[in-house]
Amino acid sequence: MESTASTSDSASAITTGLSEVDINQQSPPIILKEGEIFDPLKNLNEKQLEAFKEIKSNFSDLTDPTDIAFCTDMCFLRYLRARNYIVSKSEKMLRDTLEWRKKFRPQDIQLGGDIREIGSAGCVYVNKRDKKGRPIIFAVPRNDTLKNVPSELKFKNLVYWLEQGFSRMDEPKGIEQFCFIVDYKDFGSGNMDMKTNLEAMHFLLDHCPERMGQSLFLDPPALFWFAWKIISPFLNEVTLSKVRFINSKKVDGKRTFAELLEYVDIENLEQNLGGNLDYNYNIDEYLKENPDPIVDTPPITFSTETDSKKQKKEKKKEEKEKKKEEKEKKKEEKEEKKKEKEEKKKLKKEASFTKQQENADEVD
């Protein structure tokens, strides 16, 4: 288990980022007529449109088919919004994402591969859509009881399910965000993996701007509020407006969430959450309908640290080494000066003694 200081430092880094970047900016509701294609440029002002044209032109040199497919018009706009339409910052953020995706190839992760054990547990999965047509990513922390699974694989499993959610977006209809539902029933300290959760937030900040449309936390326990108190003061109003806490009520001995039905149709809501959907996640059934991609070589082992965090740590380490070298240099210079001073003092003393001897000889 991580120390409190480590957790606090990680939370501070994340919340600092969240205060600088809004990953969940409010967008107006999308209303399309039948057969109408969503136009992402329709509501841009002149300055925003110029920024869009500039960043799109800057990426016109892309040759990798995967990069080209990733960089849609709506993708460019997500990264622009994440950096307040400052093209240089948006471009850097997007290029960092492309580099990360090229290195780790999240689209090639195989659920039946090295994440099968954690993937079978049902800690995270994708199922159905909310009332706005957004894919729903469910998280069930109580299912995370696998102590022998390293954080790297837990993080990789989360990235897999995020990619599954992204693949279900429908950009022609303006759908580019997901709905995140976390069921905290029976959640305990043994299910808390703060490291993976914090790194997941780093990942969302660095590589998934504007993707989270709504977060619904069901029956949050006392342990959750401990973590929330650390993070929430740093979140801006727009981000907080996308988060909602919903407590259940027992009806005929079953949990029900009346407020949850504001977001999800009862037909798309699982029975254990008060809906009509008879569904229990099963990895084999899921893979039948969503087979793993066929790849020559599997993606390399994930690190739970995103590139930006690594760069910060490396920079901090370099600065520390530099300060250490400067300190050693100053110490050496100080020792050299001290030695030089003692040498001068010695020479002066010897010169004085010699003079005294000469004076004594003259007297004799």
From Swiss-Prot:
CDD domains reported in the protein's UniProt record: SEC14
UniProt xrefs under SMART domains: CRAL_TRIO_N, SEC14
Biased composition, class Basic and acidic residues, residue ranges: 316-352
Pfam families named in the record: CRAL_TRIO (PF00650), CRAL_TRIO_N (PF03765)
CRAL-TRIO domain segment(s): 113-281
UniProt protein name: Phosphatidylinositol transfer protein 3
Residue span of region Disordered: 290-364
Keyword Acyltransferase listed: no
Gene3D superfamilies linked: CRAL-TRIO lipid binding domain (3.40.525.10)
GO MF, one example: phosphatidylinositol transfer activity
Domain of life per record: Eukaryota
SUPFAM superfamilies xrefs: CRAL/TRIO domain, CRAL/TRIO N-terminal domain
Alphabetically ordered keywords of this record: Lipid transport, Transport
Function: Has phosphatidylinositol transfer activity.
